[in-house]
Amino acid sequence: LKTDSRKVQSGDAFIALAGARTPAEHYMDQAISAGATAILLESEQERQCHERHGALIVPVVGLRARLGRIADRFFEHPSRHLRVIGVTGTNGKTSVTQYISQLLRETGTPCGLLGTLGYGMPGSIESATHTTPDVVQVNRVLNRIRNEGGRAAVMEVSSHALDQGRVDNLTMTGAVFTNLTRDHLDYHGSMEAYGEAKARLFLREELHFSVINFDDPFGRQLYGQLEGQCDRVRYSLHEAQTELWLKEFTPTASGFRARVDGQWGEFDLAVPLLGSFNASNVLAALATVLTLGVPVERAVSIVRELSPPPGRLERFTGSTGKHVVVDYAHTPDALANALEALRPHIRGRLICVFGCGGDRDPGKRPEMAKEAEKRADYVIVTDDNPRTEQPCSCASCPPVSSGT
């Protein structure tokens, strides 16, 4: 079952949906040429099934809205056979997803991944095209995870995915909220609409528990909204009355030491990750696996071995002893967090090299410039995937100048 006509092989069934500027019939003809034997065709009105060049054409009214049910049934309900955890938030999704997966795997639960860094089980990860793929591909990957021995799957769930139905009809065990800061306003139009999209992940009837960052204003709002819906677990860097909170934090050259308290008791952590925001990410992952029943002592021992995802405060050291840290930070909040995170770990100058993507929200460019100027000793502005914009415009020289 395919949704991309370029990937159709002989004998496949193809789902033909209209694109932004391209009718569904165009993709249908491509799929038939590639050997598709059946086509589910998006249709505005009821029509009879018919054949076209040897392929069965099945017109379906409201096909896009039915994709979740179709994919779930086609792949024999894979999410029902796994503990599926969805992670959403502006920042931290990739790190939290990776940490949950590492903790589950090392404590005896084979766990797959879906997110920015790829889809599948460790050792057979396929490249990602989206943070959250379409609902057919989500079910295909979950089915592969199940067939390869997985018992759990942790997935990044973007606001686009929630708005576009890419996780419809999945059976989810838990959901994690990291934070909500400015991003994707070119798509959602307002922070209110952006927050509403995120909240959909937590309003699912089948959800057993939610893990919520109680330091985030929207997280507090979400926590209140979910009263009586599912078990709620709060984590915090400051609030002592939450289920898991950071009592002490000490930066070290290679990471940090922490003392944590809450409903699972008080315990110490040694974490090989940079930054206080990674303390928040680790708390989110710990709260999730402890809620799933992993023993505290076992989880604490595995935290010592956590490794950051590629491009998430990833440290490189050359022969001169100088440190270079690469981070994915692509929002003002994420850039501020990354720069602040590094300060306690360094003695010399902090030089920031950043850029903004072309054809994306231009409003955040001067805001990112302000954060860089405020927190770094020296700032270099470049472009970051200009897309259709001119590189100099994409580097946002005039907007960045106005921001600083």
Sequence positions of predicted segments:
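N-terminal leader/targeting and accessory segments in enzymes
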Residues: L1-R69, P217, W245-E248, L274, ...
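Well-ordered beta-strand positions
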Residues: A13, A38, L56, G174, ...
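Active-site beta-alpha connecting loops in nucleotide-dependent enzymes
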Residues: G19-T22, P308-G311, D333-A336, E340-G403
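Generic hydrophobic/aromatic pocket-lining and core-packing "Φ" positions
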Residues: M28, S101, L142, K198, ...
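Short, ordered loop/turn segments at secondary-structure junctions
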Residues: S43-E46, T116-L117, S159, L180, ...
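Acidic, Mg2+-coordinating active-site environments of NTP-dependent enzymes
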Residues: Q45-H50, E148, D163, M172-V324, ...
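Phosphate-binding loop of NTP-binding sites
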Residues: L67-F214, F218-D231, L283, H345-I346
